[in-house]
């Protein structure tokens, strides 16, 4: 069993504090829904856990099974069992998908995987995600549709079998059938090789399919509410306004907008900075 612990995490980007004291624990077998309005720190949290250099941890800790994640490089975090599926997967020209995935698998093993076993596992994962076999021989994400990119992230996750998986809007841009395919494969892997999951999504339908164990709502870089599937359903039906009123919270983006008066616009009619 693995445990990812985030304690009092503060993260800044270009001297602007984005996360302001996040506390979160994810255990093997759990699925955590990370919710909140756009621009309130959800993706920042995932990026900080994975070690993206743009996101600077200024306070707090991240541990995986008691080991200091912040002391690890991105590669070391990956080898330790942390996986991040990006919202916008990058294209890698000149590197075939199969070569990239084989290298990723071998980086997590003490001895290289046999070619026969790798091909068998890759073919199975591609088939499970309802992708065409030719995708293995194309350059990574080059010319892939948005849906192919997202499903290819799940192919990689199935091959790596991480301890902790962070999925950043893995369902965005997918049609109804593709969303179900992705959700089914997440649950299948969870059953075959249990992991802890943290999933960012704006769609209740996706959460209905993966059935999160816990739900967390992030606003202004803080977790303001926690619950389970019932919280997900209430937000889907009523939005976030009731929660903001209950907690007496104003979105920081709205605070900025209120500072822009008619007078300031009149003094700057062309919008010059």
Model segments located where?
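Conserved structural motif at the start of ABC-family nucleotide-binding domains
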Residues: 4-6, 19-21, 26
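Short coil-to-beta microelement around the adenine-binding A-loop and adjacent beta1/P-loop entry
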Residues: 16-17, 76
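The feature captures the beta-strand-to-loop junction immediately N-terminal to the Walker
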Residues: 35-37
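Helix-to-loop junction immediately C-terminal to a conserved catalytic motif
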Residues: 50
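ABC ATPase NBD Q-loop/coupling interface
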Residues: 61-77, 141
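ABC-family P-loop ATPase nucleotide-binding domains
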Residues: 90-163
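Walker B catalytic motif
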Residues: 169-170, 177
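Conserved beta-strand-loop-alpha-helix hinge in the C-terminal portion
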Residues: 218, 222-245
